[in-house]
Amino acid sequence: MEPPSPQDEGLRKKQPKKPVPEILPRPPRALFCLTLQNPLRKACISIVEWKPFETIILLTIFANCVALAVYLPMPEDDNNTLNLGLEKLEYFFLIVFSIEAAMKIIAYGFLFHQDAYLRSGWNVLDFIIVFLGVFTVILEQVNIIQTNTAPMSSKGAGLDVKALRAFRVLRPLRLVSGVPSLQVVLNSIFKAMLPLFHIALLVLFMVIIYAIIGLELFKGKMHKTCYFIGTDIVATVENEKPSPCARTGSGRPCTINGSECRGGWPGPNHGITHFDNFGFSMLTVYQCISMEGWTDVLYWVNDAIGNEWPWIYFVTLILLGSFFILNLVLGVLSGEFTKEREKAKSRGTFQKLREKQQLEEDLRGYMSWITQGEVMDVDDLREGKLSLDEGGSDTESLYEIEGLNKIIQFIRHWRQWNRVFRWKCHDLVKSKVFYWLVILIVALNTLSIASEHHNQPLWLTHLQDVANRVLLTLFTIEMLMKMYGLGLRQYFMSIFNRFDCFVVCSGILEILLVESGAMSPLGISVLRCIRLLRLFKITKYWTSLSNLVASLLNSIRSIASLLLLLFLFIIIFALLGMQLFGGRYDFEDTEVRRSNFDNFPQALISVFQVLTGEDWNSVMYNGIMAYGGPTYPGVLVCIYFIILFVCGNYILLNVFLAIAVDNLAEAESLTSAQKAKAEERKRRKMSKGLPDKSEEERATVTKKLEQKSKGEGIPTTAKLKIDEFESNVNEVKDPYPSADFPGDDEEDEPEIPVSPRPRPLAELQLKEKAVPIPEASSFFIFSPTNKIRVLCHRIVNATWFTNFILLFILLSSAALAAEDPIRADSMRNQILEYFDYVFTAVFTVEIVLKMTTYGAFLHKGSFCRNYFNILDLLVVAVSLISMGLESSAISVVKILRVLRVLRPLRAINRAKGLKHVVQCVFVAIRTIGNIVLVTTLLQFMFACIGVQLFKGKFYSCNDLSKMTEEECRGYYYIYKDGDPTQIELRPRQWIHNDFHFDNVLSAMMSLFTVSTFEGWPQLLYKAIDSNEEDTGPVYNNRVEMAIFFIIYIILIAFFMMNIFVGFVIVTFQEQGETEYKNCELDKNQRQCVQYALKARPLRCYIPKNPYQYQVWYVVTSSYFEYLMFALIMLNTICLGMQHYNQSEQMNHISDILNVAFTIIFTLEMVLKLIAFKPRGYFGDPWNVFDFLIVIGSIIDVILSEIDTFLASSGGLYCLGGGCGNVDPDESARISSAFFRLFRVMRLVKLLNRAEGVRTLLWTFIKSFQALPYVALLIVMLFFIYAVIGMQMFGKIAMVDGTQINRNNNFQTFPQAVLLLFRCATGEAWQEILLACSYGKLCDPESDYAPGEEHTCGTNFAYYYFISFYMLCAFLIINLFVAVIMDNFDYLTRDWSILGPHHLDEFKAIWAEYDPEAKGRIKHLDVVTLLRRIQPPLGFGKFCPHRVACKRLVGMNMPLNSDGTVTFNATLFALVRTALKIKTEGNFEQANEELRAIIKKIWKRTSMKLLDQVIPPIGDDEVTVGKFYATFLIQEHFRKFMKRQEEYYGYRPKKDTVQIQAGLRTIEEEAAPEIHRAISGDLTAEEELERAMVEAAMEEGIFRRTGGLFGQVDNFLERTNSLPPVMANQRPLQFAEIEMEELESPVFLEDFPQNPGTHPLARANTNNANANVAYGNSSHRNNPVFSSICYEREFLGEADMPVTREGPLSQPCRASGPHSRSHVDKLKRPMTQRGMPEGQVPPSPCQVTGAKAEHPVQKEGKGPTSRFLETPNSRNFEEHVPRNSAHRCTAPATAMLIQEALVRGGLDSLAADANFVMATGQALADACQMEPEEVEVAATELLKQESPEGGAVPWEP
């Protein structure tokens, strides 16, 4: 390839970074023939890489889009001249794009080498579009030729061309490749695709399960409706849609006279919405999940089969599908987006913004300093002047002579005055007074604009006009002053000033234009509203708000690219919609469909409507009907809408939220810096201004402030505010915490001590303590020691009392819900009234007791000083007053009765978790303050603009031909259903739209409903049709008005509302963390620790019985799994194949299949029961689930058999709902329908199979666990609102065709709750609001006075519904989202950090070592276990042995007396070291602190478990750490000896030297290493590297010296050929493991040719004794013989498997002293706990000279291994190695070792006699000396050290 020319280089430098057309490295040859020298290719390259070329192409694409948009689709392939012209133009575009593609292919090559044309995704897209375009043209030509030959076929042939032409709409996508910022957004969406795919699977799964359940339960139920008898006319009331009915049962009866219920109706929505077959069932379920129109479906089902239970189906569907699963999308997207943004941020964008701010501040400071300097100059000059004048001088006269001097003088004076004046002006402009004046003027301006309304009096209009001019003048003056005072440059530096200038100039321009008559006043009066933005000037002195605004402006950048993407998306779908549905939305019923695709603007609006999800289903139904209804081609239409809805609504709109959440965090980080400064100042003030307080108090204050300013985690305002809130919750704003109340246990948790010495647990009071009686007297009579008061205190603080009161609160709440709202004096209400007296009495007594105990309110800590107590008092007082006022004014009583609803709130004070959530909500509300302000301002501004645009224009006459109120009189005819035979006479009415813009308040109300996405299309079309004031609408009069609504929706509903939601989420997450702020564990650590404490080992059951084993083998094999999987899938398909009106044969087949599947699944259950035995089978929750399903299925089969039998025998129908000739389809036979569900539930088993979905499910359940208090709060909210609703709106009559009807009303409590649930999902809540406002018809049974039948409902409905909607939509549902995002952060988290999901692996692998789930394994197995688990939890198989040992020293699990470690302790130690939880510093202290933390967070942890996991202080546990520490020391000795040998070439003979050197290794090498291991400092990479190298170097040593403890004689290794023992276990599993492990070279060192310790031996599950005898570990290459013999003797000969023979058993028998009797002797002292700690037992040491000749004994390194293997190693001193009787660490050696350890910093180990002894043994072994020799040498050494030369007495 030729070198690039210099001009190429230059080009390359100049070219800015464009993603696609970068200069690609060009291949030497393109299309196999064109080289780089080829002139054609050279030309192509230069053109393609020419800068303007890209621009030209982009412009062409843009032009093409315009051409596509102008095209007018017509029905039936009609055309007009414009369309024909555009088709010609299409050829031009096609040619341009073809040329572009061809040139790029020539320049870059086509496909085969890197960077070829088709290697880029965008180019592939281009190529496909161009190719299809060319293909279409060819087809068209073919069609034309065909048409000429055979004119008949033209219609058919044209179709495929039309379909292909639709691909043109993808061209706008090419714009993406031209805009880099778009690609960030797209990238983050693409990155999120994988987790989104999992979620999509989960959603699909939900939809399938619910669709099949729907199919089973509601199949064919929707086809009956009310017809007039003998006709096909559907009987409906006015405004009512036809809906299903039921002849019998509890469905809807036909009430209209002369109507009957019969079948043959296609069904609701022209037969699209039903559950008759799987496809439509899925569509209906999906529509419900999208929360649009789900209530309609529910009400239809209710009408068809009764309302007892269908709500369960729909409500669970909404809760699971909409609230949970679909919010996962948000979790994933925001995670991905934040990551993408992090990358961008690391490039420093945000830093720049900060620096810029800093620079501006500096510059301002500098400018003001300079100007001040100038002024001072002036002052000095002035003073100088005067002195000159006073002195007087002749020279002045000389100046006077010259004429110039006066002018010069004047100019100089003028300059000085100008400077002074400008400085003064600058001061004035900068002063607070000026600022507040401006704010006042802005407020007046706002007032004058807001006072405009429809039909306002003339004087007001005049006043507004004058005010407008005056204010404009004032603003102009302000602007000029600023310009003069600050100088132009500094003035225009501020964005606000630029904006101000723009507003003022536009105002002046407006007045000039209106005065000169060049413009109508309206058009520009909208500009007047922009002045309202001036309100944002407040932000100048309000830092958090100004930062929020800055952050919003900042995120507008990221949102701009998203908007562009959204816009492209909308354009593409609008163009596609025009191709598909243009001109097709005209139906027979002559009703105009407003949301159609007949032209481009209209298509845009329709697509936007589907995107916001409002009524998208009705647009889809129209689309299906346009293609011939719910039959073959029509149904495919739904694909278009579903893709549009999913991509738009779920993905793009959630990215909005992701961006919002992201930018908020940034706004906070700006604020926090300023906050910190303020805190600093405050702290200084505080510490200065506390002279009267004691030192201690002052310290607490400053400490509090410090804590505040620190605020761990993301420093956000939310965080800081939360701190303030927490510290002020129970305080009267004083800096020290107030006394607590019994329920108020915020502060009574133990503080974790900060002192260096840990406090023992006893001092950390973990019990919730009662609040003491305050010092002051209560009611001035009861002193603190008064008997009565003490008794009251005891009662109030008793737990039974609290529970008793809670019970009464619950009962009284239930009584409220049970009231009958319609018949006020019914029997039920009278009984409840008596109950009410009882409740009130109890609550009054409670309050009196509490007041007696704590005093009323005069002193600190008294009853009324706590907000929650005041709430209690208020509730009780209301009850008492309402009882007293029974007779007086009704309205007051009514209000008071409604206030009783607050009773359940008293539970908050009693339940701690609930209280926390409520505080969370309060904090959230306070934090959201700023956002609410900004949103309200924007809303207000839009409302003002709306008033200008639409006031008085939303009137209409119901007879559309009349345009004004005068004309709209008399009667007019109407044809029912467009049928000319049915004529009806109706009176004309002049109607005002319910939502309108006649004044600012109603405008804000209308806009609020728009921002909730409910009913906005109707309002939009009203606005589009609006004409003049007080006249009727004109169809499509002002389409441009849609811009107002779309901008509003994007700005407020997409952006601000999402920021709102984002803020709530961020706040809740912060709040969740604050709860644990003092416990020093972050969320992940908490989760892992909790898992480690709660986890239990799995049973890995292998049956012993050979037949049972065969079954077990089959059941646990993977093939069996796959078979069941396939069967479940088949079952699903069979269930999905059922449909309504299926043939008899089909019915028969499905019945047979059902029986077959039931038999198969029963068989599976039986097999598993045989294999696992009942105990093992029911241990797994999935099996329990299986079992229930099988039982249910069997019942279902039996029932259906009985059914068919009864049906065939023609007998009575006796199932569900009594006997009688009942149509089986009619009655909602919950009995058999319920059992049918079991068929469907088998599907749920599939969830257990897919890994990703399983994790999703697991987290799902986790988030449910996190929700109890949130759920409780939601329940409370619903309860309170439902009861209020019953009291206020219960009397409204139910009228079909209105929103308060048979399915939707407030007459019973369950109905009220369902209605509220509907409002929470946003289903037409604004219409329910209108239906509950004043002036509605009353229920005939209610107690209204005559003539008052239209007085029900109340305008309180506005407050009621708006407050409920806001609470629900912005707080409650976001609680769901916050919890989910919290739990799902793992989807996008960093997998290298240990998290709870890693811990399952540990459980699974542990089970192989501990199949019986005893919870213990041999400590020697721990290393193998951990090497099998991958990091971050385990060590991984490539971890060198020494590093593994060092990590074990750091983990330091407690070791049981039988040499085992426990499950929880091991897991806990792993978690602790992996996450570095309290591993630094003094280990014992850290342990104690950690114990306290665990007790604080997990109060129910049993002390036994806690001691097992973290041994308490003073418990001289033997731990794995100490064991491996001796091992490491020994290794160092060995290395040291090796070095010695290499150095001297032989062994140095002098004992003392050797020992000294050995001790030095302890001190200098081993100790620091162990120290590091203990403090967990092992992560250093180089450490690992070094260890790996060392391991490799020492391979020789390892091999020679065998395994863990010292050298093993080679002859033993040769002869030790034990046969591997396999006791009927499954070879398959373990063989795999063994191969895997042996791949690692490091591993091989640990497996000498010794089959007995082969990994297979581990599987020795059934011979427990063999396990014990052999220690069964892959690390025991030298099964430490002495210890084994010893152990075997303990076990007794009988326990030994007899079959074992071989050299191993010989030495044991040979060794004389170790005969049975000897062991018995040794056993005796073991049973008593003997000597004081640390004292060496004399007996074994005195028996010197026992037979030590036996080679085995000499080599057996007893101590180190033994002190782990002997039972009861706590008093290890009692059984020192007795196998070699003289092997004792004698006093002198021990002293030296202790000294060395202390010097090495291992004091705790030095104090441990066991450890010292083991080390002494290791020292002797390494030096190859007898202990006596070591002792002699040691004594010599001590003599040299001590001055007297005598041996120092040894006291450990």
Curated annotation (Swiss-Prot):
Ranges for the IV repeats: 1105-1384
Basic and acidic residues bias spans: 690-711, 1747-1757
Ranges within the bilayer without spanning: 280-301, 602-623, 1001-1021, 1312-1330
Domain of life from the UniProt record: Eukaryota
Region spans: Disordered: 1-23, 675-712, 731-757, 1702-1721, 1727-1762
Transmembrane segments: 52-70, 86-106, 116-136, 161-179, 197-218, 310-330, 433-451, 463-483, 495-514, 524-542, 562-581, 634-653, 800-818, 831-850, 867-885, 893-911, 931-950, 1039-1060, 1119-1140, 1149-1170, 1181-1200, 1232-1250, 1269-1289, 1357-1381
Motif (Selectivity filter of repeat II): 612-615
GO molecular function, one term: calmodulin binding
Chief location of this protein within or outside the cell: membrane
Positions of disulphide bridges: 226-254, 245-261, 957-968, 1338-1352
Catalysed reactions, semicolon-separated: Ca(2+)(in) = Ca(2+)(out)
SMART domains for this protein: Ca_chan_IQ (SM01062)
Residue positions binding Ca(2+): 292, 614, 1014
III repeats: 768-1068
Motif (Selectivity filter of repeat IV): 1321-1324
Residue spans, topological domain Extracellular: 71-85, 137-160, 219-279, 302-309, 452-462, 515-523, 582-601, 624-633, 819-830, 886-892, 951-1000, 1022-1038, 1141-1148, 1201-1231, 1290-1311, 1331-1356
Task performed by this protein: Pore-forming, alpha-1S subunit of the voltage-gated calcium channel that gives rise to L-type calcium currents in skeletal muscle. Calcium channels containing the alpha-1S subunit play an important role in excitation-contraction coupling in skeletal muscle via their interaction with RYR1, which triggers Ca(2+) release from the sarcplasmic reticulum and ultimately results in muscle contraction. Long-lasting (L-type) calcium channels belong to the 'high-voltage activated' (HVA) group.
Domain notes: Each of the four internal repeats contains five hydrophobic transmembrane segments (S1, S2, S3, S5, S6) and one positively charged transmembrane segment (S4). S4 segments probably represent the voltage-sensor and are characterized by a series of positively charged amino acids at every third position.
Official protein name in the record: Voltage-dependent L-type calcium channel subunit alpha-1S
Organism: Mus musculus
